[in-house]
C-alpha cells in the first residue's frame, strides 16, 4: 500500500496543460523505477511509446483498484483483531481478497527474489535470518490463497 500510495494518488496524474484538463486527458506517465511497482503496474507493450500511451490511460484506475483492495483487506483485518471475531471475516469479497493477496505475494516475491527453489532455501535458513519470517508470510499467503480458491470452487 505504501508503494502504491496511501492516499488519493489521482492528483499525480492531472495534467498541467489547460486543454488536457478541459478534456480530462491525463498527462504522460513514466514506467515506475521500483521493480515491485513495475511488476504490479507492468508495461502493456514492448514498444516504449505505445506502452507509455497505454499507461497514461490505464495506470490511474489500476493503481486505484489495487489501493482499494489492499485498504479493504487492512480494514477487515483490523476489525477482526479489534473486535476479536475468532478468526472469521464476515462478508468477504473473494475476488478482492484474491487480487489483494496476489499483489502482496508479487511484492514479496520481487523483494525476496523468490524462484522455484525458494522453498528449499527457506527450509535451510536459520531461524535468526530476518528474511525467514518474511518468506514465511509469502508462503502462508500462497496457502491462504489456495484455500480461498478451493472454498470458492467448492461452492
Regions found by a protein language model. Give the residues of each.
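Charged, alpha-helix-forming regions
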Residues: 1-68, 72-87, 93-155
